[in-house]
């Protein structure tokens, strides 16, 4: 039986003969032959191991080959629909760019640019000059530098200013960010020497003062943006640390994390320290993210005193950590939105979604509910109140009131429906709880409605 099945396996040339010319030209003969060999060998191995009792036909092998090559051509990084209500979803790409920032990236990608060319002098220029001016205008800093992420920014600052020197940090601020990246490890890699002061829940100004030695290179303050310590607590403000630092002639570095440029508490969100407030308190160097709360491209932005920034720019690590033209293009336009606060709120998707009016979200929920009326034979839809979150390790206490679309079905349980939506050609990421699938309308975009309808329709008709 086994020998008969092995003899029945189709020959590669026979299978090639039934492909149309377009498919052969599009994929190339060598690629198709390689895929067919793998498919036939897999079938042969399964026959020998008595895992199957059939040999593929030419047509079956052809179909498998087409499917495999089509799958290989699919993008690994693809569009997904965020129905979770987590605005800055770390796993779904964090912040979305504005329309104008997206266009700027496309232009930088599809044409030559003055990335490192001084158009006035007709000679080599600096990529950092393209964006330093706008950062200074918005923050009031003397100088600025952009690298590829905030962890890189803080490491570069410490290595440039505090190599082989002691850096004093409160134990309550030795944070861990995503992917197990911890401030102590970043400091160790920068060759700065960590000096911990205070306790996890309480640190006093005298703790900082008592830790000062001849080897002290800086005070480091780290904003705990992704957690809160409550109860019997005490921390030292940046302003108080700066007063002590000025008296002792020690620089102050602050990592404020998410990069808030606007006081969002006026829009009902949790109060977070802004970059401007940090600089005004006397901090010498501030680092923050270019995406997350700022709403731009992933980057680490360093602002502060010119004498320190100039020294950081000369560090050999700066070139290793430099940003590309796409990041600069996206970040420049995003920052220019901030020249007008109203424009920033309306055009930067992250800010727009976080400050979205509850009535607007309800309107969205009603619109989606109405759009899905034709699918009532497959599902039961209802609208419920709920809560969204900011995400991205920002504002851990902020809960944003929202409206959710609840989806129930007698044909498919919530676990399988969530999986089907997640595995759809344009994946739809949802919430599952209380025995149903939920879509949070806060993070649903205008182009998402049709995709949601089509996905639910196809799943219902299976």
Swiss-Prot record:
EC numbers for this chain: 2.9.1.1
Modified residues annotated as N6-(pyridoxal phosphate)lysine in this record: 292
Cofactor or coenzyme needed: pyridoxal 5'-phosphate
GO molecular function terms listed in the Swiss-Prot or TrEMBL record: L-seryl-tRNA(Sec) selenium transferase activity
Location relative to the cell: Cytoplasm
Disulfide bonds: none
Similarity field: Belongs to the SelA family.
This protein's name: L-seryl-tRNA(Sec) selenium transferase
Gene: selA
